[in-house]
Amino acid sequence: MERIVRNGKSSLLYELADRIGNVVKEEEDGSGVVSDNAVAMTRIGQELDEVELKSNAHTLIVKNDEDLGGMDATIEVIRVMNGVCNDSDIEEWNLNDCSSKLKELVLGDNCLQFVKKMKLVGFTSLEKVVFGTGCFSNSEDGLLEVSDCKELRSFKVGAGCCVDWSSFVMKNCGVVEVSIGDGCFVNCENTVFESGYC
């Protein structure tokens, strides 16, 4: 209790609130949008990736390597579960097929560890990008580019991501919040942050 008073918040509660966020849904009668606080519930001791998540026609839930190929122009949300797609043969993940409608890209912890390049260029509807901890952590000389994403508002990278990547470019995005965790881009030689939408 003293720590909460001293720091002004409970770090655990703050982290939980941050993970919960708001789920926005459209009312069936067309009366508008309703915002609900919601979170995927699990049983105690059960990882989120063990829970069967239901996907709709516009959501891609990546649970294994084969799911990476399930993208098309109708995908609006991509969620990658914890610890998946860590085959050393997966060095690049091309998301261009869903560049026009993708609104949200959320990676769980410790996934896509051998990917060397992630380019999100010209994603006109993209609003939120979240990388969990330890993503892209077993590849060297990698490139992360996020550019010309005018609708992008939130970009978060968890601790220990892209450790040995050499380039991080973010330009011409409408980003309001950028959060980079500890130990990310440790060996980065080229870092560019530019905005044409100020």
State where each predicted segment sits.
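Leucine-rich solenoid repeat scaffolds
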Residues: 1-34, 178-181, 188-198
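Well-ordered beta-strand segments characteristic of repetitive beta-sheet solenoids
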Residues: 3-5, 14, 60, 76-80, ...
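Intrinsically disordered, low-complexity segments
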Residues: 8-9, 29, 33, 86, ...
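Serine/proline-rich low-complexity intrinsically disordered segments, especially terminal tails, linkers
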Residues: 12-13, 33, 37, 149, ...
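N-terminal capping/linker segments that flank leucine-rich repeat
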Residues: 13-82
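LRR N-terminal entry segment and analogous cap-like coil->beta motifs
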Residues: 54-117, 121-123
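Concave beta-strand-loop units of leucine-rich repeat
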Residues: 79-86, 107-112, 122-125, 131-136, ...
